[in-house]
Every structure is written in structure tokens, then in C-alpha cells.
Amino acid sequence: MDERIISSETVDAEEVSFETSLRPQTLSQYIGQDKVKNNLTVFIEAATLRNEALDHVLLYGPPGLGKTTLAMVIASEMGSQIKTTSGPAIERPGDLATILTSLEPGDVLFIDEIHRLSRAIEEILYPAMEDYCLDIVIGTGPTARSVRLDLPPFTLIGATTRAGLLSAPLRDRFGVIDHLEFYTEEQLTEIVLRTAGILDTKIDDLGAREIARRSRGTPRIANRLLKRVRDFAQVRGNGTVTEKLAKEALTLLQVDPRGLDTIDQKLLHTIIQSFRGGPVGLDTIAASIGEERETIEDMQEPYLLQIGFLQRTPRGRIATETAYNHLGISYEKEV
């Protein structure tokens, strides 16, 4: 699959480094997610006053909304060190045991894609999260024995795009569960202006708003689009990102005014033209457009549902009248 400029996943190590350079250090610097921030401010202050570790935190929502950044900010606000890993990287119980025994009092352990932990790994986490202890087995066969090791108080922050895949026992052990929502156009405009300042890029308010409008409610996409539009401003303009230049650049990048690219349009056209608007099953859509089912579920569908272009029903996906209008296709409602 070709790289999508509006993909909400990080595409390479360079982009990871770029995102790291943009990250805020405090909750006051973190733009958006106000409900989540307000609650976390109280929880962090209360834990600090009691000289306790913050309750374990689960952050869930579509990719690119700032779950990793928020984990870093929480650690910073707590004055704690943070150790990061991911579900796929923890393959064996020994991998997790090594990480847990290296923690210092008050540390934050961040596990991205926590829904991809195996059940065997999850079972090691249960006593670690509840009682700050680690049960390990020494030896094999008849001589094997279980030894319990004490762990220092720590905070586990888990991030996932698919909270429904977490087992109930693991999910129930998180004291704080927060859903990150898509960002408003105003919030994304503020993010674009902030990033432009860090990049020393000249941009006016209307130029920033045009980029924000096409960023699918996602800061990661907004920052990526800004970098590409900046290139057009330097090569084809006078170095300043204006509304006119942003529109021209984003049109050339095949990102339409609602943030849809050719893959999104292909998905909607397929539902409308090949399946009479639906309902049609996700596996059928995936096979028709040559995408993985999981890619559609995680990367395309959440935004299309958010803006009202798709409906999800027990019988399958349906393209809405709004989607027809956006694509310039006549909508005939079935009687």
C-alpha cells in the first residue's frame, strides 16, 4: 500500500523524531482534550499531595490524537521517569519481568498498543498493577517453585486504538480510563500555528485554518500537512503559507476540503456504485478496494463515521446522503 499523507499512523523514524520535537511538556501546553486534561490535573495533584503513585491510566482512541504525548506529559507533571514499550515488543513473560524489576519508585511505564499483549503477559500484569508484586517461577518440573518479588509503586499507562480488544480483567485494573476525541477545527488551527512557530515557518491564520480543516480532526495529520504545504510555500510561493497557497498545495496532494484522499473516495465510491450504497460487510469492502479490514476499521472508518459519511449497522456499512452529496452523486432514497 502506498504511503498516505493523511494516515494517522507514524510513517517512519524521521516523523517520530519530528513529533518528539513538538511535544508539550505540561498539561497547560497540551492543546485540546479539555475534559481529559481537567480530570488528570485533579488526579495528579491529589496523588502528589498524598505522595502516592498516580492510579493506572488507560488512554484509548483513534491513532494520532496524542496518547503517547499525553503519557509523556503525565510523567512530566508527576516529576517521574517514563519507560516506554509496546504490546508487540513484549513477547515473553521474561521481557515484562525485566521491565518491571527495573522500575524505580514513582516511575511511569507506558505500554503502547496494550491490546496486543498476550493473555500470559496480562496475567503477570495483574498482581503488578494491583499489589505491586511480581510472581515468577524458578526452575522446571517437580522442583519448580513460585517466588513473589515486591515492586516499587509505579503508574502503568496503557494506550490503545481498540479498547474493546482488552480483556475485562485487565481493563478493570485501570483506575483512570479516558477516551481521546477528534480535535475541533479551532484546536487544530492552534496546533498548526504552534508547530509553524517551532519550525520557523511563516503562516497566516487563514492558511493555518485551511490546513486544520483538512486534517481529519487529528494533530499528527495537521503537522504532516503543514510540513508538505511549507515545501510548496518555499518553492512556489514567497515562503509564507497563505489560505490560497494551502488550498493549491493540498489539492495537488489530493486531500480534499473534508480531508478525504483518493483511498477514502474509492471506499465511498465502491459502497455507492458497486453495492448501491450498502449495507455491505467490511470484509467485502476490504476485498473490493484492496485494503486490510483492520486498516479500514482503524484508519478510515472512525473519521468517516465522525463526519457522517458512513453509518455502521448490523447488516453492514451504509454510505449516507451526506457522502453522496460530497462526491457529487445523485442520492435516491429507497422507499
Swiss-Prot record:
Organism lineage: Bacteria, Bacillati, Bacillota, Bacilli, Bacillales
> Which BP terms from GO are recorded?
DNA recombination; DNA repair
* PANTHER family for this protein: HOLLIDAY JUNCTION BRANCH MIGRATION COMPLEX SUBUNIT RUVB, PTHR42848
NCBIfam families associated with the record: PRK00080.1, ruvB
Name of the molecule in the record: Holliday junction branch migration complex subunit RuvB
Q: Where is this region: Large ATPase domain (RuvB-L)?
A: 1-183
Sorted alphabetically, the keyword list is: ATP-binding, Cytoplasm, DNA damage, DNA recombination, DNA repair, DNA-binding, Hydrolase, Nucleotide-binding
Q: What class of enzyme is it?
A: hydrolase
> Which Enzyme Commission number(s) are on file for it?
3.6.4.-
Which residues are noted in the entry as DNA-binding? 293, 312, 317
Write the signal peptide boundaries.
none
Sections of the chain in a coiled coil:
none
